[in-house]
């Protein structure tokens, strides 16, 4: 088979199963409204949960820092790219979340890959929730460690897997809030089981940080867990982009030596770090609390109004509200029907989710109003299916 035949066959297979992904060009993609092809839609696909991507204080912080530092960092943090803005943000994050150290990464994907790649060796074992993010599972598959996956949020299955003999070290991997199901992991129980078996715990709290817990400290704080490795990302609740790993002093020093994604990547722009510090200040303030409370009320309003006889609504109380429709083509038709009525929603299909669980992944944000939720419910219930 030639290279071209391999490429063509893969694309043909995706088209045949209604799983071919496509991108949409938008002129505004975050906030209450999405604008595409000159038309305005209510936006139910954004991860900007607290509406901070449009916050004037955060925008101003980035602009001022860009004037001071320029628009790029100029190099890896190990060469010339670790500025006072990066240092200040790392210290603020560590203090806020109660860890000795924080290390910044250019993305959550890079952070997850870096930690697992740097830590795991031959004869080690990774025990990951089967619904863990692609960045975690890919890193686990590529590492020299053995990967075992436990049934989603099933702590008994996790315990059984950890009990089986392992010559090396064991790492338990889970998420705080799951990106496709919107539910949360039983983190306190998972942590207890991990420690009983002398395993470390890595939690990716991309969708919980900033949005849940006291001062927005996230799912671990809310549920009483403190993993050895906490990954937080800044493209959701923070409204910006990037990520950080929270850990001990020694683990931070280790990652600075052996995390190739960190050592060999240009660091985030200092202006971005400054904007993230401004975002953190909003998250921790009374305004941040009010934004979280408004979002929670909108989620409750939506869940109370969904017609459960027509859609499978998962037990999710986060900003992520998936409606399971099962069939790929039906999910695509439903997303298109919503767009025709001015509501932008995304159909999620395999391989992102298991076969037979195609869904509309609806995301609610603080930028929405109650009337937006009511409109979404009206359109959903009127969609001709």
Curated annotation (Swiss-Prot):
The signal peptide stretch is none
Cofactor(s) it depends on: pyridoxal 5'-phosphate
Specify the domain of life of the species encoding this protein. Bacteria
CDD domains per the UniProt record, alphabetical: KBL_like
Output the InterPro entries linked to this UniProt entry. Aminotrans_II_pyridoxalP_BS, Aminotransferase_I/II_large, AON_synthase_class-II, AONS_Archaea/Proteobacteria, AONS_Proteobacteria, PyrdxlP-dep_Trfase, PyrdxlP-dep_Trfase_major, PyrdxlP-dep_Trfase_small
One annotated GO molecular function is: 8-amino-7-oxononanoate synthase activity
Q: Which residues carry this modification: N6-(pyridoxal phosphate)lysine?
A: 236
Query: Under which pathway is this protein filed?
Result: Cofactor biosynthesis; biotin biosynthesis
Keywords recorded for this protein, A-Z: Biotin biosynthesis, Pyridoxal phosphate, Transferase
- Gene Ontology terms describing biological process: biotin biosynthetic process
Which residues are involved in binding substrate? 21, 133, 352
Enzyme Commission number: 2.3.1.47
| A Pfam family this chain is assigned to | Aminotran_1_2
PANTHER family linked: 8-AMINO-7-OXONONANOATE SYNTHASE (PTHR13693:SF100), CLASS II AMINOTRANSFERASE/8-AMINO-7-OXONONANOATE SYNTHASE (PTHR13693)
* Subunit-structure text: Homodimer.
What does the UniProt function comment say about this protein? Catalyzes the decarboxylative condensation of pimeloyl-[acyl-carrier protein] and L-alanine to produce 8-amino-7-oxononanoate (AON), [acyl-carrier protein], and carbon dioxide.
Q: Which family does it belong to?
A: Belongs to the class-II pyridoxal-phosphate-dependent aminotransferase family. BioF subfamily.
Kindly provide the name given to this protein in its UniProt entry.
8-amino-7-oxononanoate synthase
Task: Say which species the protein is native to.
Answer: Salmonella dublin (strain CT_02021853)
- Lineage summary: Bacteria, Pseudomonadati, Pseudomonadota, Gammaproteobacteria, Enterobacterales
């Amino acid at each position: 088979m030639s290279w071209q035949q391999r490429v063509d066959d893969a694309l043909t297979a995706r088209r045949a199963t209604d799983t071919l992904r496509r991108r949409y060009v938008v002129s505004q993609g975050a906030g209450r409204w999405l604008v595409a092809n000159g038309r305005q839609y209510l936006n139910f696909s954004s991860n900007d949960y607290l509406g901070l991507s449009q916050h004037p204080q955060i925008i101003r912080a980035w602009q001022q820092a860009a004037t001071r530092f320029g628009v790029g960092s100029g190099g890896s943090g190990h060469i010339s790219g670790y500025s006072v803005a990066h240092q200040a943000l790392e210290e603020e994050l560590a203090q806020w979340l109660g860890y000795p150290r924080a290390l910044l990464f250019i993305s959550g994907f890079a952070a997850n890959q870096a930690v697992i790649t740097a830590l795991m060796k031959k004869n080690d074992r990774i025990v990951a929730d089967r619904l863990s993010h692609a960045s975690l599972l890919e890193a686990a598959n590529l590492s020299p460690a053995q990967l075992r996956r436990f049934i989603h949020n099933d702590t008994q299955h996790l315990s059984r897997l950890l009990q089986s003999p392992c010559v090396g070290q064991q790492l338990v991997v889970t998420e705080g809030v799951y990106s496709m199901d919107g539910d949360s992991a039983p983190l306190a129980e998972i942590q207890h089981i991990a420690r009983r078996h002398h395993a470390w715990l890595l939690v990716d709290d991309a969708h919980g940080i900033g949005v849940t817990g006291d001062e927005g400290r996230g799912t671990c704080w809310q549920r009483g867990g403190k993993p050895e490795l906490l990954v937080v990302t800044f493209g959701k609740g923070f409204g910006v982009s990037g990520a950080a790993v929270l850990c001990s002093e020694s683990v931070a020093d280790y990652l600075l030596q052996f995390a190739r994604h960190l050592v060999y990547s240009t660091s985030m722009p200092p202006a971005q770090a400054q904007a993230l510090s401004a975002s953190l200040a909003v998250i921790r303030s009374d305004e941040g609390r009010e934004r979280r409370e408004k979002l929670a009320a909108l989620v409750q309003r939506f869940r109370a109004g969904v017609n459960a006889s027509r859609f499978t609504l998962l037990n999710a109380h986060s900003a992520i509200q998936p409606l399971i429709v099962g069939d790929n083509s039906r999910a695509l038709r439903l997303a298109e029907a919503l767009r025709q009525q001015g509501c932008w929603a995304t159909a999620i299909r395999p391989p992102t989710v298991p076969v037979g669980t195609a869904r509309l992944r609806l995301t609610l944000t603080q930028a929405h109003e109650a009337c937006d939720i009511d409109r979404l419910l009206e359109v959903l219930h009127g969609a001709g299916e």
